[in-house]
Amino acid sequence: MIRKAEERDLTAAAALAAELWPEHTPEELLPEYRALLKNGDGAVFLASENGREAGFAQVQLRHDYVEGTETSPVGYLEGVYVREEARGRGVAKALLKACEAWAAARGCREFASDCELDNGGSLAFHLHTGFTEANRIICFTKPLTPERGETHEY
């Protein structure tokens, strides 16, 4: 069963999200999900099987440029995760369909997502569910710290 998360579901959603993104704790993610519910620019969907949370998906509206798209806003799959014991039964696909329907109801004509370059499972899921690859990029960062003795004002 797929349902749109409400306030009472956010602790479970944050716990599932922390399984997908282990660099974050549920306590860190909970305020983000509360804000998502409040501002209406995104939603979280939960999948339940046999009375237990089996997975979640997070969708948001993106108003900035999204690789490979031509319209705005774009529905964006921020993350989808299904617990191992529930995989292979169409749960992720059902969560995706709920996210797509949510975005379409908000006027989106395109839907997008991303995955890490080395995440073969996610790549296969995206291709299997009708996404086409738009681009591959490598992003770079570096700290902005002045060299010893250097100061610049612009």
Write out the residue ranges for each language-model feature.
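Conserved beta-strand-loop-alpha-helix junction that forms the acyl-donor binding cleft
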Residues: 112-122, 141
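Active-site rim helix/loop that mediates acceptor-substrate recognition in acyltransferases
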Residues: 25-46
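Helix-loop element at the rim of GNAT/NAT acetyltransferase active sites that forms part
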Residues: 14-28
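Conserved acetyl-CoA-binding loop-helix of GNAT-fold acetyltransferases
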Residues: 82, 88-101, 124, 128
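A short beta-loop-alpha structural element at the N-terminal edge
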Residues: 1-13
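Conserved acetyl-CoA binding element of GNAT-fold acetyltransferases
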Residues: 70-84, 138
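Conserved GNAT acetyl-CoA-binding A-motif
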Residues: 96, 103-115
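Conserved beta-strand in the GNAT
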Residues: 46, 52-61, 76, 81
